[in-house]
C-alpha cells in the first residue's frame, strides 16, 4: 500500500509530462513575416483581441465605404502567406485586413492555438473593420485558408449579417484531419491517438463535432465559395464536396482548381473567379 501511495505523485508527474509533450508537439511553428504588401497603400495595425492579446495585421483601405475582407492564414502560417491575394482583390475594390492569428506571425502568444481561437480572432478583425471610416461595415466577408477556412465557416455559422465567405482548402472534420496527421507520424490511433484527440478537445473546450465544417455549414446563411486544390494531399478535395453536401439550400458554391494544399499555382488565373463571387455577394465600392 505504501508503495502505491508514494507512486501516485510520480505517476501524476509522468502523466503531466505526457500532456505537456502533446501540447508542445501540436503547437504551431511561429513564422514571422519578412515581406510587406509592396505597392499597396497599406498600414501596419495592432488590433486588440480576446484575452487582451494584440493581433498584428496589415490594413489596406480601398477608398471610402468599400466592402472589406478579413483574410486569415492556416496553421503555422502568417499574413505574408496570403499576400498573393492582396493586390488583385484590392484592385477589385475591396479593403483588406490581412491578420495574424494568436501564436502566429507577429501576433501575441497565448496558452494555445485552436480553430475556435482562430474564429475569435477573425471576429475581432471583423469588429475592427466595421468601425473604420474607409469601410462599409454592412458589407464584410472572410477569406480563410485551411484551419483559417474552418474558422471562417464557424464564424459564419454564428454571425448574422456576414456578407460572404471564401474557404480555401477547408477540412471537413478536425478529427479526420488529426487522424491523418497522426498516421503520417506513425502514431497508432489506439490507444495513443484516441487519447490525443480526447485531450485536445478537453484543452480547447470544444467537441470536434461542434466545430467541424461539415457540421457548422448547416448553420451558415451567407454565400460561401469553397475553393479546393484537386491535387491536395493534405485535405482531399472530396472533403470540400462533403462540406457542400451538408449545407442547407444553395448558399455554397464549389470551385475545384489545379493545385495542392498550399500552392494553387497561377493565382492570377483563379483570382478573377474569387473576385467575381465577392463582387456578386458584397458589391462594389461606393
Question: Could you tell me what each predicted segment is?
Answer:
Residues 154-206, 215:
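Hydrolase active-site cap/lid region
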Amino acid at each position: 500500500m505504501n508503495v502505491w501511495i508514494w507512486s501516485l505523485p510520480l505517476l501524476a508527474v509522468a502523466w503531466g509530462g505526457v500532456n505537456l509533450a502533446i501540447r508542445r508537439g501540436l503547437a504551431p511553428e511561429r513564422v514571422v513575416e519578412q515581406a510587406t504588401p509592396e505597392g499597396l497603400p497599406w498600414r501596419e495595425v495592432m488590433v486588440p483581441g480576446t484575452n487582451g492579446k494584440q493581433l498584428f495585421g496589415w490594413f489596406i483601405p480601398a477608398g471610402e465605404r468599400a466592402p472589406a475582407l478579413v483574410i486569415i492564414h492556416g496553421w503555422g502560417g502568417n499574413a505574408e502567406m496570403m499576400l498573393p491575394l492582396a493586390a488583385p482583390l484590392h484592385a477589385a475594390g475591396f479593403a483588406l485586413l490581412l491578420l495574424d492569428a494568436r501564436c502566429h506571425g507577429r501576433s501575441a502568444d497565448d496558452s494555445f492555438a485552436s480553430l475556435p481561437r482562430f474564429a475569435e480572432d477573425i471576429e475581432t478583425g471583423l469588429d475592427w473593420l466595421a468601425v473604420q471610416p474607409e469601410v462599409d461595415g454592412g458589407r464584410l466577408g472572410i477569406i480563410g485558408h485551411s484551419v483559417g477556412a474552418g474558422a471562417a465557416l464557424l464564424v459564419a455559422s454564428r454571425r448574422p449579417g456576414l456578407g460572404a465567405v471564401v474557404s480555401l482548402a477547408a477540412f471537413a472534420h478536425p478529427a479526420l484531419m488529426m487522424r491523418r496527421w497522426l498516421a503520417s507520424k506513425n502514431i497508432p490511433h489506439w490507444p495513443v491517438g484516441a487519447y490525443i484527440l480526447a485531450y485536445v478537445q478537453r484543452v480547447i473546450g470544444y467537441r470536434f463535432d461542434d466545430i467541424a465544417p461539415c457540421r457548422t455549414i448547416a448553420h451558415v446563411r451567407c454565400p460561401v465559395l469553397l475553393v479546393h486544390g484537386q491535387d491536395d494531399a493534405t485535405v482531399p478535395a472530396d472533403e470540400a464536396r462533403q462540406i457542400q453536401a451538408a449545407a442547407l439550400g444553395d448558399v455554397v458554391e464549389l470551385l475545384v482548381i489545379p493545385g495542392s494544399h498550399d500552392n494553387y499555382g497561377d493565382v492570377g488565373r483563379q483570382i478573377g473567379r474569387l473576385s467575381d463571387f465577392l463582387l456578386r455577394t458584397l458589391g462594389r465600392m461606393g
